[in-house]
């Protein structure tokens, strides 16, 4: 499957799909910086902790389809163990982030994954991200530890640097392309289900939507390790 490029804010274009992806993980692991790098190609060294609900969008083109990625940040709620079920509702992808220089942030990954799977669709596409790879001399989480965890839990895995923009695009696009592949496959199967009168259950234009938009058929994804 070809991977599409992305725009940082085109207006008036037809959107084929809206995919909600959530960022989760301990505070100060760089979730907001990853979001800023992917959504706006920005990085702010003076970035303060995120306060309030926040999400950003980026329009992408995958296999000649226009996809709007809606990426949600925990908005600092994780500091108070206050991430709510509403945050996860409607998500078809998740970026589970830890800091390679903070062992505790990796040790908490299992708890975050349990919470995610307790609130989201059981087959949500998940990417485990070891952020701050630019700080390799301060590393305390071996890459192999994270790889083994990802393989055991059937997750994608990459190490990233929001500062240097290393693998940020790859990580998000891997998740979004996998979601698109799954949705496209479901649509293809549905389109082949033609009843005796010749009508097909065509799903072209179906969106995977987020709370506050019109309802759409539920999606199920299957995760796999790349």
UniProtKB/Swiss-Prot annotation:
Where does it primarily localize? Answer: membrane
One Gene Ontology molecular-function label:
GTP binding
- Motif Effector region residues? 47-55
Q: Which residues bind GTP?
A: 25-32, 73-77, 131-134
Q: Where in or outside the cell is it found?
A: Cell membrane
The way it spans or sits in the membrane comes to:
Lipid-anchor
Task: Determine if Methyltransferase is one of this entry's keywords.
Answer: no
Q: Which UniProt keywords apply?
A: Cell membrane, GTP-binding, Lipoprotein, Membrane, Nucleotide-binding, Prenylation
Gene Ontology CC: one annotated term: plasma membrane
Q: Which Pfam families match?
A: Ras (PF00071)
Residues covalently joined to lipid (S-geranylgeranyl cysteine)? 223-224
| Family, similarity comment | Belongs to the small GTPase superfamily. Rab family.
Function description:
May play an important role in plant growth and development.
Q: What is this protein called?
A: Ras-related protein RGP1
- The record lists the organism as Oryza sativa subsp. japonica (Rice)
């Amino acid at each position: 499957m070809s991977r599409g490029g992305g725009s940082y804010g085109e207006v008036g274009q037809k959107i084929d799909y809206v995919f909600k992806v959530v960022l989760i993980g301990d505070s100060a692991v760089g979730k907001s910086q990853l979001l800023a790098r992917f959504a706006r190609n920005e990085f702010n060294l003076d970035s303060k902790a995120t306060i309030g609900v926040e999400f950003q969008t980026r329009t992408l083109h995958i296999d000649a389809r226009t996809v709007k990625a809606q990426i949600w940040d925990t908005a600092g709620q994780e500091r108070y163990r206050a991430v709510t079920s509403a945050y996860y509702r409607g998500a078809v992808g998740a970026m589970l982030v830890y800091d390679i220089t903070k062992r505790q942030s990796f040790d908490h990954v299992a708890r975050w994954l349990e919470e995610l799977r307790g609130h989201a669709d059981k087959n949500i596409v998940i990417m485990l991200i070891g952020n701050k790879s630019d700080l390799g001399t301060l590393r305390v989480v071996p890459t192999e530890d994270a790889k083994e965890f990802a393989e055991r839990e059937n997750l994608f895995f990459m190490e990233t640097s929001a500062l240097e923009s290393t693998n940020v695009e790859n990580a998000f696009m891997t998740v979004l392309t996998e979601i698109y592949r799954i949705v496209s496959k479901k649509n293809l199967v549905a389109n082949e289900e033609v009843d005796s009168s010749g009508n097909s259950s065509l799903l072209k234009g179906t969106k995977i939507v987020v709370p506050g938009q019109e309802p759409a058929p539920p999606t199920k994804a299957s995760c796999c390790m790349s």
